[in-house]
C-alpha cells in the first residue's frame, strides 16, 4: 500500500511520464480526467470525433484531476470533473472557463435546471461546462428467479420493504446480500475502513432521505441547514439500522457485511449457495456481476421505492469543462457535448453509457440495463426528483472526512447508539466548518 506521504510523488511521476509521452506524440487536444470502466469505448468515441474534425485527441487519466489542474492547467485543453462542488474553486482560479456560449435557448429543455445550477456560478449567470454522463445509485437489485418465487412483490416505500424483510427472512435465509468494503488492501486497521466503506452506507442514507422527505429536505440537509440529529435524518438512519442490525435479514450476517468487498453483494445475489433475493447497490453493481449471467434474465433492479416522491433518483455524473478557447479545443468540445456523442458507445452490447441529455436517441441502446437506467434518470429529471450524491456536495469535504467514517462506525454498533452518532457527526461538521 502506498503511504500517504509518498502519494504526491507517485502521482507526480505518473503524470510527468504520461505527459512526456504525449510530448513525443503531439496531440491537438488533450483531455484530462479519471480512469473509469469502459474507457476504451470512450477512446473510440474520441477517435470518431478525431476523424470528423481532423484534430488528434489524447485522453490522459489522473488520480486527482482537480489537484493536477491547480498546478498544471496549461498542459491540457479539456477536463472531465466528477464532483460539481470542485467547479467553483477552479473557476475562481480562472482554470476552467465559462461555457455559456455553447448553450442555447433550448438548453433548458435538454438539461434540467437543477443540473445546470450545480455547475453554475452562485448567481447562476455563468455555466462552467456541460454534463456528459449521469448514473443512478437508486436501485434495488434482485435475483430474477428468486424474486419470482416470492411472487414479484411491489413496494411503495422503503419501510414496506423493511417490513417485508422482517416477515420473510429466517436465520438461515436472509433476503439481503449486503457488503460495504471497497478497500483494495486487506486486512486493514479499523480506522482505515471508514472512507473505504462508509460511502456505500451514505448512498443508502441519501436515497432514504430523498425517498421519504423529498428534494427540499434533501437540499437543506446537504447544505447543513438540517442536521443529522434532526428527525428526518435520524429516522432515515433508523431505517438503515432496521436492516443491517437485524442479523437474520442479511446473508452471512453483519460481520460479513462489514468486512466483505462490495462486489460480493453482486456475486452472492447470483450464487447458487446463497438464497438472498435483494441487494442495495448503485449502477456499478452491473459491472460486478459474474460473466456467465445476463441482465434481465438472471438479475434486474427495481426503482428505489417512495410513497410521495415516486421516481426519485440519487446519482452522480461527469462534467466536461473548458481550459482554453483555442479553435481545436472548442471544436472538440462541441462534439463531445452534442446529442450524438455516445451513440457508438451506447450501441455496445455491454454498454454502461448513460447520456445526460434528454434528446439522446435511446433507440441506439442495445443494452437493456443502460437503456432502463437512462429512462429512470430522465424521468427523475423531468419530475425534478434527481439529486446529486449528497456526500460529494457537502461543504469542505465533510461528507468524505466525517460522514463516511461515522456511518461505517454506525454499521459496527447498533440502533442504541443512533442519536449519539448523529450528534457526533453534527459536532464534527460544526467544528470543521468553523475551522475553515
Task: Indicate residue ranges for each PLM-predicted region.
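Conserved N-terminal structural module of periplasmic/extracytoplasmic solute-binding proteins
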Residues: 1-88, 108, 154, 427-436
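Short, solvent-exposed loop/beta-turn-alpha elements that line the ligand-binding surface or hinge
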Residues: 100-113, 191-195, 212-236, 291-292, ...
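Short helices/loops that flank or line small-molecule/ion binding pockets
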Residues: 65-79, 147, 163-172, 260-279, ...
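Hinge/lid segment of periplasmic solute-binding proteins
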Residues: 86-142, 181-182
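Glycine-centered hinge/linker elements that transmit conformational signals in sensory
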Residues: 219-260
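Extracytoplasmic/periplasmic substrate-recognition and gating elements
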Residues: 285, 290-356
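Conserved C-terminal helix/tail region of periplasmic/extracytoplasmic solute-binding proteins
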Residues: 16, 366-436
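Extracytoplasmic/periplasmic solute-binding protein
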Residues: 126-132, 162-222
Amino acid at each position: 500500500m502506498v503511504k500517504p506521504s509518498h502519494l504526491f510523488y507517485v502521482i507526480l511521476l505518473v503524470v510527468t511520464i504520461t505527459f512526456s509521452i504525449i510530448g513525443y506524440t503531439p496531440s491537438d487536444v488533450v483531455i484530462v480526467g479519471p480512469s473509469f470502466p469502459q474507457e476504451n469505448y470512450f477512446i473510440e468515441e474520441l477517435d470518431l470525433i478525431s476523424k470528423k474534425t481532423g484534430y488528434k485527441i489524447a485522453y490522459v487519466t489522473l488520480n486527482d484531476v482537480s489537484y493536477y489542474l491547480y498546478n498544471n492547467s496549461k498542459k491540457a485543453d479539456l477536463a472531465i470533473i466528477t464532483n460539481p462542488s470542485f467547479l467553483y474553486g477552479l473557476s475562481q482560479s480562472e482554470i476552467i472557463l465559462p461555457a455559456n456560449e455553447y448553450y442555447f435557448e433550448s438548453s433548458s429543455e435538454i438539461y434540467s435546471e437543477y443540473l445546470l445550477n450545480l455547475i453554475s456560478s452562485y448567481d447562476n449567470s455563468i455555466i462552467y461546462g456541460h454534463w456528459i454522463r449521469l448514473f443512478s445509485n437508486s436501485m434495488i437489485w434482485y435475483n430474477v428467479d428468486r424474486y419470482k418465487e416470492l411472487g414479484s412483490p411491489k413496494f411503495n416505500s422503503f419501510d414496506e420493504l423493511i417490513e417485508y424483510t422482517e416477515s420473510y427472512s429466517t436465520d438461515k435465509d436472509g433476503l439481503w446480500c449486503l457488503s460495504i468494503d471497497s478497500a483494495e488492501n486487506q486486512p486493514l486497521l479499523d480506522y482505515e475502513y471508514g472512507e473505504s466503506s462508509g460511502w456505500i452506507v451514505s448512498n443508502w442514507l441519501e436515497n432514504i432521505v430523498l425517498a421519504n422527505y423529498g428534494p427540499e429536505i434533501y437540499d437543506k440537509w446537504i447544505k447543513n441547514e438540517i442536521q443529522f440529529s434532526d428527525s428526518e435524518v435520524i429516522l432515515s438512519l433508523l431505517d438503515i439500522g432496521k436492516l443491517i442490525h437485524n442479523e437474520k435479514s442479511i446473508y452471512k450476517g453483519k460481520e460479513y457485511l462489514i468486512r466483505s468487498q462490495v462486489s460480493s453483494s453482486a456475486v452472492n445475489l447470483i450464487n447458487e449457495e446463497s438464497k438472498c433475493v435483494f441487494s442495495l447497490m448503485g449502477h456499478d453493481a452491473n459491472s460486478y456481476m459474474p460473466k456467465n449471467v445476463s441482465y434481465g434474465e438472471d438479475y434486474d433492479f427495481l426503482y428505489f421505492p417512495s410513497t410521495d416522491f415516486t421516481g426519485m433518483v440519487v446519482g452522480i455524473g461527469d462534467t466536461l469543462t473548458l481550459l482554453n478557447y483555442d479553435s481545436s479545443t472548442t471544436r472538440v468540445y462541441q462534439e463531445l457535448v452534442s446529442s450524438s456523442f455516445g451513440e457508438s458507445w451506447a450501441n455496445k452490447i455491454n454498454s454502461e453509457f448513460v447520456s445526460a441529455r434528454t434528446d439522446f436517441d435511446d433507440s441506439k441502446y442495445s443494452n437493456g440495463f443502460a437503456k432502463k437506467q437512462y429512462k429512470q434518470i430522465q424521468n427523475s429529471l423531468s419530475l425534478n426528483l434527481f439529486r446529486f450524491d449528497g456526500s460529494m456536495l457537502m461543504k469542505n469535504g465533510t461528507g468524505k472526512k466525517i460522514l463516511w467514517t461515522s456511518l461505517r462506525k454506525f454499521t459496527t454498533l447498533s440502533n442504541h447508539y443512533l442519536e449519539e452518532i448523529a450528534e457526533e457527526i453534527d459536532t464534527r461538521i460544526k467544528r470543521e466548518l468553523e475551522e475553515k
